[in-house]
């Protein structure tokens, strides 16, 4: 059976809306899943793994815990990046548009791989991103150059320096 990208997006938007996601949030979440799936990051498998959790918890947004000149800390309150990833990327992007560079740590969040789509989309505004997170027994580093349509995806084993459920993002005009 063949299904178009538009049909997948429409179905996922309805599914996320049924889970309690707000307009805008369910658009972004559907985009994240489809982008990962169409670019070889197994978006549907990742969604299936988290669906039970999403179905049993109310959607919550991240809280700003700390802010200084170039750094932010957001608390995801145990939610998925499908819900709080867009606001994290929008926050760091808006800070970089006003200055030179910024860093953001999103703590207490899950499904961090979904952030890749948001970083790629934001990179289309000539911004560069580097993101780090821990995934099971390894760490992931994603680099996105300004204007890039695909990330550079690397894994490494420095587990002790990356918290289990956190995501670190750095953004600038070039990194």
Q: In which residue ranges do the predicted regions lie?
A:
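A glycine-rich, acidic short-motif signal
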Residues: 50-162
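A structured, mid-to-C-terminal "fold-capping" secondary-structure block
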Residues: 170-175
């Amino acid at each position: 059976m063949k299904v178009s990208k538009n049909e997948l997006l429409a179905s996922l938007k309805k599914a996320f809306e049924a889970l309690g996601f707000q307009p805008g949030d369910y658009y972004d979440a559907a985009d994240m899943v489809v982008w990962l799936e169409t670019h070889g990051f197994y978006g549907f498998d990742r969604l299936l793994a988290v669906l039970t959790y999403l179905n049993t918890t109310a959607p919550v947004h991240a809280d700003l815990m700390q802010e200084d000149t170039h750094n932010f800390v957001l608390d995801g309150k145990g939610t998925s990046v499908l819900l709080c990833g867009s606001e994290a990327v929008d926050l760091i992007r808006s800070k970089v548009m006003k200055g030179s560079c910024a860093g953001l740590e999103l703590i207490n969040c899950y499904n961090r791989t979904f952030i890749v789509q948001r970083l790629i989309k934001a990179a289309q505004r000539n911004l560069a991103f580097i993101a780090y997170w821990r995934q099971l027994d390894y760490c992931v580093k994603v680099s996105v150059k300004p204007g890039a349509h695909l990330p550079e995806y690397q894994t490494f084993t420095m587990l002790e320096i990356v918290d289990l459920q956190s995501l670190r993002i750095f953004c600038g005009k070039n990194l």
